[in-house]
């Protein structure tokens, strides 16, 4: 009985060790795998995000503690072009789909039909938006 219990415990510990190694390896091997979006969604870098109707001028920065005063609609799409998340509104930094550009600064790798780039600085954080002229 003791032998079976010990074997089961060793097997369990071994499986946990293998799982921990594979999780650590996959994270290290794919540091750019996901893009964080406020709202709790994580998109693969090959997914598409549409941002239309951004009201700030290209290159405009807003510093300090105030609102960015950006109005936009963001469409997060899966790889089959199905909309999985849509948000519309202003003060995008606080409420809506912000791309964490530090994950992968070449944002056009996962933005679709990017026609203009917007850099918004809010509380010292620089965020990059790609605006699309139309929703497909």
Regions from the language model: what does each represent?
Residues 1-51:
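N-terminal prepro-regions of secreted/extracellular proteins
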Residues 29-136:
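Mature secreted bioactive peptide module from preproproteins
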């Amino acid at each position: 009985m003791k032998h079976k219990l010990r074997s089961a415990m060793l097997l369990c510990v071994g499986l946990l060790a293998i799982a921990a190694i594979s999780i650590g390896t996959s994270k290290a091997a794919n540091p750019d795998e996901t893009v964080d979006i406020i709202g709790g969604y994580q998109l693969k870098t090959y997914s598409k995000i549409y941002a239309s109707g951004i009201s700030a001028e290209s290159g405009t920065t807003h510093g300090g503690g105030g609102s960015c005063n950006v109005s936009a609609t963001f469409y997060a799409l899966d790889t089959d072009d199905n909309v999985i998340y849509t948000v519309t509104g202003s003060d995008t930094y606080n409420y809506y789909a912000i791309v964490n550009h530090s994950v992968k600064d070449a944002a056009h790798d996962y933005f679709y039909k990017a026609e203009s780039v917007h850099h918004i600085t809010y509380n010292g954080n620089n965020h990059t938006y790609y605006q699309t002229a139309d929703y497909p």
